[in-house]
Amino acid sequence: MHSFYIQLDLFKRHRIRMAPTRKTRRNNRRQNRPSSKIQHHHMLLRLELQRCPTKHDKEKVSRMIQHIIQDINMKSLATPHVYYVEYPKYNEGLTGIAPIETSHIAFHFWTRPDPKILHTAKSNCLLEFDIYTCGSLSQRNVGHVLHHLTQYAPTYADITILNRNTGLTIERHMHWNSEQSQLSWANWLETPAFH
């Protein structure tokens, strides 16, 4: 016992620091980890639609993207940039990007997609849409995005949420097909999957 008190006295007098214990090192590592709010979610959305926006709808689509940004609790860094692409052939359609505080939203509507790549007879338009954020995308956020796209009468949806925090991990995958599902688009959006 006596030697313990002598060592303790030496540490106090000479301000000698003890080597960190295993438990201390573990706690320090935990404190240095990024917050769980940093998830690096990436939503990849492939939608087939009955209706496609035209080149005259650039402003309308820009407003829709601004509403999506608000509804998923993101912060816009600039007005979305929306363009109509005419060339090359079969690439025609609206395309755009919106910078957000945590990264970006990017999309392209193909007004004349190759019918061989479409899944339903009613599909006339193809939309590829992605949101990347170093934040988190909840099921409710995904539902908000899909709700805004309802105006184009979706016929097929393929949605993948990647968590890119430590790799490319598929966190969620959802699929809907108007010709195979017993649920309509509106009813599908009301399921617990989006709440």
Task: Locate predicted features.
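Polybasic/polar functional segments that serve as interface/processing modules
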Residues: 2-195
